[in-house]
């Protein structure tokens, strides 16, 4: 294998490889090449929400790197473990999801993962295959492999114990079940975010318990969201969804905080930061263009860039620019309608009250005209047909009659 490929695999966008670091991974790769046996590289995802965002793509991109080098990429859907709920990063127990919810979310995850992974060679599995059939004796064997003290060494559990917050016994099963997945799949390497270190080590421990060669673990950094502070999350509204329209995606990424731009380039693109312009604004634009072009197409990214510039400068843009603006059909609302209600219906604000707040703050424009009256309303669709509705500098809708 090419030395540069190995260096990229073990270094680019990688937080830690354990045990043994990059040397251990290099040995595994060399042994696999000598034996002409591809490595089995596992990535488990619990479908606990219906959509993927850029934070999820960091580890998916790393899985694709292994896949492109001829190794067996395994995308494991946590159909069973998602019903338990991963306690990682949580100060209290997660609400439990139903099997129907998990199945619905899993379908969406797989559809969106096609944007990153090659499904022609991907092995897709679901841990309900083996976990739903475990009998009590097998579960006791898993529980007996780990002490309560070891579980409390997991930061989240330890903090909750010290705070007197309830820790439920089914939560202890989560890392054990995730670890058993590696046994069932004969994983050689498991990928995950840095917050998954405890769970990845559990996979090694259980593989040894069951007489198998323990996997290597490779972690990737957690992507900080657009607020520049916390991990990217839809609930914190600091995210970029992988299926967002090109204009929204471009507009969000063009506002990436300066301190995050280099990190985003490393984790979300194949571009070298050293070859980029030193101008911070030009870097932001290049980042937005690269990521939007990757998840949509270079042509759509360019149209989004032109449309975003037209919307922000107030030039109105050309017909081609307007075509890049996502549409909202006015047939989906009843007239007369208040502007705040329209903002919610069009997906520009999560709630009517947030729409009112944005109007009062002067963030709402209709065809570049700022509207600050929270009681603003419209009697009929004809008043809005063809108009561009805008909230801030990132969110746009073109209002169409049908």
UniProtKB/Swiss-Prot annotation:
Keywords: Aminoacyl-tRNA synthetase, ATP-binding, Cytoplasm, Ligase, Nucleotide-binding, Protein biosynthesis, RNA-binding. It catalyses: tRNA(Tyr) + L-tyrosine + ATP = L-tyrosyl-tRNA(Tyr) + AMP + diphosphate + H(+). The keyword Cell membrane does not apply. One of its GO terms (molecular function) is RNA binding. Its EC number is 6.1.1.1. A motif ('HIGH' region) lies at residues 47-56. ATP binds at residue 234. It is found in: Cytoplasm. It comes from the Bacteria. GO terms for biological process: tRNA aminoacylation; tyrosyl-tRNA aminoacylation. Residues 337-401 form the S4 RNA-binding domain. CDD domains: S4, TyrRS_core. A motif ('KMSKS' region) lies at residues 231-235. GO terms for cellular component: cytosol. Catalyzes the attachment of tyrosine to tRNA(Tyr) in a two-step reaction: tyrosine is first activated by ATP to form Tyr-AMP and then transferred to the acceptor end of tRNA(Tyr). Belongs to the class-I aminoacyl-tRNA synthetase family. TyrS type 2 subfamily. Homodimer. This is Tyrosine--tRNA ligase.
